[in-house]
């Protein structure tokens, strides 16, 4: 899946679209995607000057965006302006190595389970053979304008 197909599936846009390409997609099971990390990313100006490092929360967001692509494919749906896919939880997030300009971040997501409209995924972000981040992610789809139940 190239960037043209990705922007039809995700509502995110620059500077918050964090998936550049899907290289593997196995329906109802797993996805592998790429985020090419460049020195032009706006967050590098302040994180950290002289030693730029991709913020961990953005690595988690990249994993969540890849999970959204997998979920919409599994549901056989195309998102529209009436529905959004929300990240609702993160468990066990661990950061193992910094992600720097020039790195190619590989985003590997597998579906763990779907229960009561909540999707649970296992996510692994790596650079080459090194794990950069691992986490369990939970997401759900909501209609825009649906009342908040919290």
Curated annotation (Swiss-Prot):
Catalytic activities: a (3R)-hydroxyacyl-[ACP] = a (2E)-enoyl-[ACP] + H2O
Residues of the active site: 47
Gene3D superfamilies to which the protein is assigned, alphabetical: Hotdog Thioesterase
Query: What does the record give as EC number?
Result: 4.2.1.59
Q: Which UniProt keywords apply?
A: Cytoplasm, Lipid A biosynthesis, Lipid biosynthesis, Lipid metabolism, Lyase
Protein family: Belongs to the thioester dehydratase family. FabZ subfamily.
Can you say what this protein is called? 3-hydroxyacyl-[acyl-carrier-protein] dehydratase FabZ
Organism from which the protein derives:
Verminephrobacter eiseniae (strain EF01-2)
